[in-house]
Design a protein with these regions (language model features):
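Short, surface-exposed secondary-structure edge patches
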Residues: 2-6, 190, 231
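RNA pseudouridine synthases
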Residues: 1-155, 265-269
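Pseudouridine synthases involved in rRNA/tRNA modification
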Residues: 19, 36-38, 167-174, 184, ...
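Short, conserved beta-turn/loop elements at beta-strand boundaries and strand-helix junctions
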Residues: 78, 141-142, 156, 181-185, ...
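A structural micro-motif recognizing beta-strand termini
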Residues: 137, 191-194
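Long C-terminal interaction/binding lobes of large macromolecular proteins
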Residues: 177
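Intrinsic-disorder/low-complexity, polar/charged segments enriched in Ser/Thr/Lys/Arg/Asp/Glu/Gln
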Residues: 129-133, 146, 172-174, 186-188, ...
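A short beta-turn/loop motif at secondary-structure boundaries
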Residues: 98-101, 169, 181-183
């Protein structure tokens, strides 16, 4: 057939497509099936800070959904040409921290192995400060404070127990908070985690008598229904880099703060973000 031939009625065309085209990508390349929809807070050649929406899991879980935050990040970097799995045998872009499916906010991703090692160590050494905004039921007796307790994780129930006295298998938790406002039976609270345990904010504030609005696991469904929320009003809205040791290739981040500029539930509450 000549290249300038025009198809005519009755012509038959045969296409030869490799079988691999119809195969499901292997799990390590599942990101190829995902369309990235990222809200990027900050990005450079080493790290990526993404504002994860509530409802999106950070990693693959028992639901086996391919659409995870890390898959979206890998897909995004693949499309940019910054991640080429066929050339990279030992490293794939990875998350440095994680938050619950129904918690929104900043998650840090490393673009290279050296960044991942440094970030993991900085997080372990508490040289990276993460602050949260949340809505909690009730009026706090103090405008600010530091609460200490003990937390034990139940792997079977996938929830935690908090107690004021030591628990067998429990770990110490320390939660700092500042009340930013109160109205209609709800407080807007900024929380800093001195320790970072599973469900710490949700379980600790509930233990103090102030469950998060929308939290079905540690709150009351009747209250959540009246509030009109189906997931907890909790956002990891700010990250501060406060290095006390050498930051290596990430030293330029020392002293910098990144935050989500618009948290819907806080804005609807009436909080003025220009104050921050």
């Amino acid at each position: 057939m000549k290249e300038n031939y025009q198809l005519q009625a009755g012509d038959e065309l045969c296409f030869y497509i490799r079988d691999e085209f119809f195969e499901t990508p292997p799990s390590e390349q599942a990101f190829l099936t995902v369309t990235p929809k990222l809200n990027i807070v900050y990005e450079d050649e080493n790290i990526l800070l993404v504002n994860k929406p509530a409802g999106l899991v950070v990693h693959d879980d028992e639901s086996n959904t391919p659409n995870t935050l890390i898959a979206q990040i890998q897909s995004y970097l693949y499309q940019k040409g910054e991640y080429l799995p066929e050339r990279e045998n030992t490293f794939a872009p990875a998350l440095c921290n994680r938050i619950d499916r129904n918690t929104e906010g900043i998650v840090i991703a490393a673009k290279n192995a050296q960044t991942l090692r440094i970030m993991n160590q900085k997080i372990k050494d508490r040289e990276i400060r993460k602050s949260y905004l949340c809505l909690a039921f009730g009026r706090f007796s103090k405008a600010s404070g530091e609460a200490r307790a003990y937390l034990r994780k139940d792997e079977n129930k996938k929830q935690v127990t908090v107690c004021d006295t030591p628990l067998t298998g429990g770990r110490t938790i320390v939660t700092r908070y500042q009340v930013l406002g109160y109205k209609d039976g709800v407080s807007l609270v900024e929380v800093d985690l001195v320790t970072g345990r599973t469900h710490q904010i949700r379980a600790h504030l509930a233990h103090l008598g102030h469950p998060l609005v929308g939290d079905g696991k540690y709150g009351k469904n009747a209250d959540n229904k009246r509030a009109g929320r189906t997931y907890q009003a909790l956002c990891a809205y700010q990250v501060e880099f406060r290095f006390t040791t050498d930051g290596g290739i990430l030293s330029y981040l020392d002293g910098r703060t990144f935050r989500v500029r618009d948290v819907a539930f806080a804005r609807q509450f009436g909080y003025d973000f220009t104050k921050k």
